[in-house]
């Protein structure tokens, strides 16, 4: 938030416009190799298994990290980022736990880029 407040008015408007544009894409449901995936930025705040994804607000997908000890879906895999896996016991590698896949390997903080293939579950690192 501090960085946002340091922007000039035009830059702040640009950020707000960008957020408005991506708000329609706060989550993505994908089917690959007969498996269903839900892709979100961070997690699903106030998760309710009876609630449809489009009933959540954009902020619900970007503000609260996923709890990998929790199984969000039994018939879908939740793929998340936002929190580097080094903070989740992943040693900078992709973490798979309870039908969740955490893919943020800390590339933005000097770690490596983790790539997860939805089709076959393989991992690659750059």
Kindly give the residue locations of the regions a language model identified.
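Acidic, His/Gly-enriched loop-helix segments that form or flank divalent-metal centers
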Residues: 1-102, 106-111, 122-125
């Amino acid at each position: 938030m501090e960085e946002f407040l340091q922007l000039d008015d035009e830059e702040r408007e640009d950020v707000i416009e960008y957020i408005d544009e991506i708000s329609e894409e706060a989550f993505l449901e994908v089917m690959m190799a007969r498996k269903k995936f839900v892709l979100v930025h961070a997690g699903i705040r106030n998760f309710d298994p009876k609630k449809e994804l489009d009933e959540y607000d954009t902020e619900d997908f970007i503000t609260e990290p996923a709890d990998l000890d929790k199984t969000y879906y039994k018939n879908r895999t939740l793929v998340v980022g936002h929190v580097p896996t080094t903070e989740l016991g992943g040693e900078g590698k992709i973490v798979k736990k309870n039908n969740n896949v955490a893919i943020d390997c800390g590339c933005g903080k000097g770690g490596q880029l983790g790539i997860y293939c939805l089709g076959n579950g393989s991992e690659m690192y750059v």
